[in-house]
Amino acid sequence: MRILIILSIILCSLFTKADLEYVDDDIYNYNGSSNINGCREVYDPYEKFNRKIFAFNSVLDYIFLRPLAVGYKNLTNDYMKARVNSFVGNIDMPLTAVNYGLQLNYDKTMKSVWRFIINTTLGIGGLFDVAGKVGLSSDRQTFGNTLAHYGVGPGPYLVLPIIGSTNARDMTDPIFTNYALNPLMYYTHKDFELSVLAVSKINDRYNVLSFSDYVMKNSLDPYATIRSALHQAREASVQYPKNFKCPKPKNVNSN
């Protein structure tokens, strides 16, 4: 059983966590238009390699992960999807609290902690967003957000086997986000952790199903379209220091 769960997580990583997660408005609150102005251009010096890996990942996604997302879409109603989305968002709150703490933003750290406590208890394990109704909102934070907070730019655009699309700054997120900085990983059973990760990945893939289908069917260059969408959305989800200026490499790809 554990092997099946691990396999599901690996497959679900192909087109969600790194590729398109940041494109979905329910996952991130895009409030950093100044960041888009600072890092408007995509630095893609490894484009030839990236395109080959993108094609490889896309085939695996079409064979394995997309059918799971389509099945999830067809077999669950909107009410259940909303509960799963709320549950997944709540599971991320301890990680968000840790990253806000690393950013020395203690107000948002405590809001994230209380949001997790309220939704886990009154919200029945996070199935209902009770905290949001009383004004306790919190934008999801990863280690990449923390690095950006201290002035680390996105760096080169990368497409990695299995992991998917990312950049030099965010490429460690799968490790730090899912394990090293996530308190739940130290206090829950391994089977529970793996099950939650699998559900989270499938939920993420479903959230971008319409977008990815449209791009793959209609875009003349799906690679460039997804690269641009991911870069813009990710840059809008991070907050750089005041007066931060994104480095401008000689060879860049404009959005």
UniProtKB/Swiss-Prot annotation:
This is Uncharacterized protein RBE_1331. GO terms for cellular component: membrane. Residues 1-18 form the signal peptide. The keyword Membrane does not apply. One of its GO terms (biological process) is intermembrane phospholipid transfer. Belongs to the MlaA family. Keywords: Signal. InterPro entries: MlaA. It comes from the Bacteria. It comes from Rickettsia bellii (strain RML369-C). Pfam families: MlaA (PF04333). The keyword Nucleotide-binding does not apply.
